[in-house]
Amino acid sequence: RKRDRIETIDKQAGTKVLLSFGRPSSGATLLHLTNQLLRRGGTHPNVTALHITTDKDINPIEADKFYQDSFRPILRAAEELEQPLETDYIVADEVESAVLNKLTSERYNLLIVGAGVRLSSDEDDREASSMRQQMSRFMGSLPMRTTESLLSIHSMLRDKMAFFVHRAPCSVGILLSRSFDSPKHILVYVRSASDLRLLPYARTMAENNQATLRIVLSTGVARESLNSHPGEEIITTDKLCSVPAECDLVVVSYTYWQESFDTCEELLAQLPSTLILNLK
């Protein structure tokens, strides 16, 4: 079983990843996630960082400055992680379509994006910030996590997930970041047999961060199918219960996210950083 797992992770470590980011700081966060998710020892994933702007009126000097400003944090993170990184800067009318074209033409295995604000334009970032401020004035008694959930998830995350999940020719990972760093307590939901494919990723995250791993297993999935590893905690339940306070990363399939989390605002407000995976 250990050998099978190593072979699986070795394949992941050679994965060709497109990391698409908008805000400069989010690029560094997504690179840390990708490295933790796919690195196996000294074997790193093959990552291309993509930033897209929709402003076609910028001149070459401005474009060079935008490039430097946009990629500085992720290049710094790549150096710290010793993670090889290619970069690509594109000017396009539609961000999502440009990402899809690159995925299709260059045959990537995995797309990684963030869920906090829309993919690329600074204007969208400013609109999101303005919405948060307006929401805070009307809902000042609510914690920021609740406000972030209502805004970031419902107004932006659904459309982004649906577009890429249904149109991308590869697997998709979407990070809902709550100050994502190096998680120490990871929770993964295995609600069906197909969700067993999440385990190698969750286990690699746990191993690379020296973290604990808790598996929430549906009663419809045979416990023996987990090939459980020492130190893992397994909880068998069909109830969608509160996320433990100490948990700092949730891993969940896109299907289960749609069925459960996306319809429960109270649970959304509790979520720590969450990785939503649609594996193909």
Each predicted region: which residue ranges?
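Regulatory modules associated with amino-acid/nitrogen control
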Residues: N101, S105, V165-H166
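Aromatic/hydrophobic pocket-lining residues that form π-stacking "cages" and hydrophobic walls in ligand
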Residues: T34, I74, V99, M161, ...
